[in-house]
């Protein structure tokens, strides 16, 4: 599998860590949980930026993003509680970070002597996305504490 194909997976692949999966999941959750929906929507907007940038990069590599292989079966929107949704999202963000870090390492291994210009751009893009995903983990972790406190009051 070439690097461009791995970017397709990150972009809209039928995997839980794709940007399209994240966009759909967060926007669906926004409608399910009014009290924390705006946070989910804010994160979804950032995921949309990732989706856009990855699509641009795939185009720069000569790929086309007009024929998605996406399946909505990767999206989970049935939850017992807001706390469960937040936990699922934290894990998805962590899994996404790990997937992008693996992709960065693969790019480096494929360019052991000197990074090509496209490899350098790819790593910069992925590092920016990883940074954003780490912010999402922090935001969601804080949200998890808040939701747990709220749900504890209701019990």
Q: Residue spans of the language-model regions?
A:
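Non-heme di-metal
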Residues: 4-155
């Amino acid at each position: 599998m070439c690097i461009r194909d791995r970017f397709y997976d990150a972009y809209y692949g039928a995997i839980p860590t794709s940007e399209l999966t994240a966009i759909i999941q967060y926007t669906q959750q926004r409608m399910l949980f009014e009290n924390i929906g705006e946070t989910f929507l804010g994160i979804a907007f950032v995921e949309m930026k990732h989706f856009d940038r990855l699509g641009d990069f795939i185009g720069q590599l000569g790929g086309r993003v007009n024929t998605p292989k996406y399946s909505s079966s990767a999206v989970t929107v049935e939850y017992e509680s807001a706390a469960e949704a937040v936990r699922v999202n934290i894990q998805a963000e962590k899994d996404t970070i790990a997937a992008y870090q693996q992709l960065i390492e693969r790019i480096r291994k494929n360019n052991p002597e000197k990074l090509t210009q496209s490899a350098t751009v790819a790593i910069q893009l992925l590092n920016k996305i990883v940074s954003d995903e780490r912010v999402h983990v922090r935001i969601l972790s804080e949200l998890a504490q808040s939701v747990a406190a709220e749900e504890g009051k209701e019990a």
